[in-house]
Design a protein with these regions (language model features):
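Conserved GNAT acetyl-CoA-binding A-motif
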Residues: 114-124
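Conserved beta-strand-loop-alpha-helix junction that forms the acyl-donor binding cleft
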Residues: 123-132, 144, 151-155
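Conserved beta-hairpin
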Residues: 48-70, 93
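A conserved beta-strand-loop-helix scaffold within acyl/acetyltransferase catalytic domains
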Residues: 72-79
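A short beta-loop-alpha structural element at the N-terminal edge
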Residues: 1-15, 26
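Conserved GNAT-fold acetyl-CoA-binding loop/helix
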Residues: 14-39
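A short helix-loop-beta-strand connector motif used in the catalytic cores of GNAT acetyltransferases and
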Residues: 39-52, 56, 86
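Conserved acetyl-CoA pyrophosphate-binding loop and the N-cap/start of the following alpha-helix
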Residues: 96, 100-108
Length: 164
């Protein structure tokens, strides 16, 4: 079962994000708090949204076991003059993989993108994550090999912001 995450899901989402960081060998970068996640998902200014996957037959609002999630937000294509959907994180517990949860999460996101008039649906994947790359290709997604990803964080971000 796939559904929109609600405020009560924040603790499990935070725990799953921690597991994702471990899987991606990025534990040292997981510094976000449960409180900040909840504020950004459900506060006055919502920066992102999330879907959760619950195990089959479970009542997700009472005792269902959340086995995966997708966290996403809108971006914008100036070339298309249309919004886009960006998948920040997709994670399914290792023991629950190959049961269709990832595909159902992505299908739900594709439907959201179409319903909202998005011109594209994008995400990134670590180069070493071959199982995910094969999965995405099987869905019909294509890698954007001609594009690179850049990021400013910490001191570099502050330094650029402080330039006179």
């Amino acid at each position: 079962m796939i559904r929109a995450a609600g405020p009560a899901d924040v603790p499990v989402l935070h725990a799953l994000i921690r597991e994702l960081a471990q899987y991606e060998k990025l534990e040292d970068q997981h510094v976000g708090t449960q409180e900040a996640l909840g504020e950004h998902l459900f506060g006055a200014r919502r920066y992102c949204e999330a879907l959760v996957a619950s195990s089959a037959g479970a009542d997700a609002h009472t005792n269902g076991r959340v086995v995966g999630f997708a966290l996403f937000f809108h971006n914008y294509s100036t070339f298309l003059a249309r919004p886009g959907l960006y998948l920040e994180d997709l994670f399914v517990l290792p023991a629950e993989r190959r049961h269709g949860y990832g595909r159902e999460l992505l299908r739900a996101l594709a439907r959201i993108a179409v319903e909202r008039g998005c011109g594209r649906f994008e995400w990134s994947v670590l180069h070493w994550n071959e199982p995910a790359i094969r999965f995405y290709r099987a869905l019909g997604a294509t890698p954007l090999d001609e594009w690179g990803l850049f990021r400013l964080t910490g001191a570099a971000l502050a330094a650029l912001a402080d330039e006179a």
